[in-house]
């Protein structure tokens, strides 16, 4: 008798392997560098011209292997997958990820929105292949993957959403143009924030200081991992380290977007769908709980929950998460 997807996922989770705690115990933090177990620099880096905006693209794995696309969340960058992506690549995939515009090493564009990010994603994907491929997204990247799956279902064989599942609540890491209601105080607050950063760059600090700032939003992630992220997601200048994130971006925003729109479209996904949900709520998470999704999963959909894990499932339990994803897309 053929095992169900849920049964097969339970089997691979049982051999989950290393957790963040295991890996962090063996990390080595220097003054300006960090060695983190299993982290791998991308095998290839290139740029995609997305209608005049340069998008930094990163790849792990054999260039001749079938592609698997990986999308990061808001206030993040592709190198946050330096542990997770190589694990997927070891499963026989050419893993392709990229920095969203105004994130990481992609160009800082004067205009940014989820619609612009979607266009950039399509440009990257079509630059790599015209063959249908799996797509995996975390947080905002997961929500973007849902939109791509709804708009271009012929391009994707499987869709995995890592803790970016919609509910009736507003998402915390959307950009400033994507708010539930256009309120005067929100608009005024955004303009005040813009005026307060005339130099157009983020506050500098030491490597430990930047890791500590990130820990305020990601309290479940280890200091060792956050320190590693500084070395791959910040630039080191004469006055210290600065995150390579648009200084105009901040939590929240304003505009017409409503989270229920994504939720209402979820049942219509035609490809096999896997949702991964961490049950420990935290600031960067979406606050979605399993009951929010009851009746909304697509016909070929499966929801897998992780007890004792927060928003960054693939960082807290990278080996287990990679095993579950590889089992699903295979």
Where do the language-model regions lie?
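Alpha/beta-hydrolase
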Residues: 200-281
């Amino acid at each position: 008798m053929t095992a169900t997807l849920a049964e097969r996922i339970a089997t691979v989770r049982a051999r989950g392997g290393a957790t963040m705690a295991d890996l962090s115990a063996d990390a080595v933090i220097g003054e300006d560098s960090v060695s983190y177990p299993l982290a791998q620099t991308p095998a290839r880096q290139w740029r995609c011209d997305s209608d005049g905006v340069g998008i930094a693209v990163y790849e792990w794995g054999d260039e001749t292997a079938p592609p698997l696309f990986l999308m990061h969340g808001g206030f993040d960058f592709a190198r946050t997958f330096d542990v997770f992506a190589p694990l997927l690549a070891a499963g026989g995939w050419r893993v392709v990820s990229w920095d969203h515009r105004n994130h990481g090493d992609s160009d800082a564009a004067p205009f940014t929105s989820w619609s612009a990010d979607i266009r950039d994603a399509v440009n990257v994907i079509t630059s790599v292949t015209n063959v249908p491929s799996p797509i995996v997204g975390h947080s905002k990247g997961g929500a973007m993957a849902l939109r791509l799956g709804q708009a271009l279902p012929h391009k994707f064989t499987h869709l995995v959403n890592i803790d970016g599942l919609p509910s009736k609540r507003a998402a915390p890491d959307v950009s400033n143009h994507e708010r539930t209601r256009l309120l005067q105080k929100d608009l005024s607050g955004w303009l005040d924030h813009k005026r307060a950063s005339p130099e157009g760059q983020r506050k500098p600090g030491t490597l430990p200081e930047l890791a500590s700032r990130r820990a305020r939003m990601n309290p479940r992630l280890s200091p060792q991992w956050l320190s590693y992220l500084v070395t791959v997601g910040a630039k080191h200048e004469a006055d210290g380290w600065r995150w390579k994130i648009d200084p105009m971006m901040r939590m929240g925003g304003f505009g017409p977007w409503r989270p229920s729109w994504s939720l209402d479209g979820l049942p219509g996904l035609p490809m096999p769908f896997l949702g991964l949900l961490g049950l420990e709520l935290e600031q960067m998470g979406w606050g979605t709980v399993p009951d929010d999704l009851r009746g909304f999963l697509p016909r070929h959909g499966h929801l897998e929950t992780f007890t004792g894990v927060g928003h960054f499932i693939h960082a807290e339990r990278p080996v287990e998460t990679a095993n579950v994803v590889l089992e699903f897309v295979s």
